[in-house]
Amino acid sequence: MSVATEPAAVPQRSGQELVRATDLVKHFPITSGVILQRQVAAVHAVDGISFSIRKGETLGLVGESGSGKSTTARLLLRLLDLTSGQIELEGEDITTASGARLRNVRQKMQMIFQDPYASLDPRMTVRDIVGEPLVIWNRWKNGGATRVAELLERVGLNPDHANRFPHEFSGGQRQRIGIARALALQPKLIICDEPVSALDVSVRAQILNLLANVQREFDLTYLFISHDLSVVRQVADRLAVMYLGKIVEIGIRDELYGRPVHPYTQALIAAVPIPEPVKERQRKHIVLGGDIPSPVNPPSGCRFRTRCFKAQEICAKEEPALVDRGHGHPSACHFAEPLALIP
């Protein structure tokens, strides 16, 4: 288990937007029948979320499993088609991009996957894995082998091991290979989908430091997805909190950790362990009841109301908008109120 430590100071980022997502919706149909299929329901994986990511910053996307984080990542990469909504990259609408235009878009966006074991082809050498993007884009002949060696060295691996296979490396080393592959085409946005959750605690800090270093060196922008708020606190400039397909709170990291206003955010932060026993005993604890409702049939009004300790009648009738309610950043709660959880 990871623990909360003091985060690095939030650096100044460019005010220029790299990515803008507007009213993203992704419903997966549930069908019935074998020959004549008909839709009988839908999984509301992502249901009308909007956010932007500025150049050079790290936006943390947090929430429990099943909240829609990974689906959001795949929508941004256009690995899934939107049910509705709009995605812009550097001011260009890429919502319906296809063919050669979509290929050009995708070289600007790469992904680091959660599982360093399943995300690398066991039949390929490290040189082939890291160099595959260069081959696809016809760049291998122009110094591809040299580029692979440089990338391996940059992520802390010995270039002399480029002919080895993934099974000859540890989990942390495999994730370094995945990072090198993501850097091969010099992307502008890298989506980190739980990049350290499958690693030993002793290795996590090394990978997080590596991600921070290459971000500074190559002027990268990150969307960092995780369910572990103590990890996200170390890397994110801003946080967006998701619950059942909705963003319920979004703001600057220190604001959300210091004085969260949405009950769900408060419950998540209250669950982050503190390494100091005295502070751990003094902190406020919030226990949520029940399980996350089914995304096939989400609750009316506020989706969090079935587990919320502040829920009232209006919460079942009216869905709260994601707006600033006078607390400095947007939240989606009728009764949003700052709460200091850590003494």
PLM regions: where:
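Helix-to-loop junction immediately C-terminal to a conserved catalytic motif
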Residues: 77
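Short catalytic/signature loops enriched in Gly
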Residues: 2-17, 30-37, 250-343
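Conserved ABC ATPase signature
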Residues: 165-169, 173
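Conserved ABC ATPase "signature" region
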Residues: 93, 143-160, 213, 266-270
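P-loop NTP-binding/switch modules centered on Walker-like glycine-rich loops
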Residues: 188-191, 195-199, 203-281
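Conserved ABC transporter NBD signature motif
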Residues: 85-93, 105
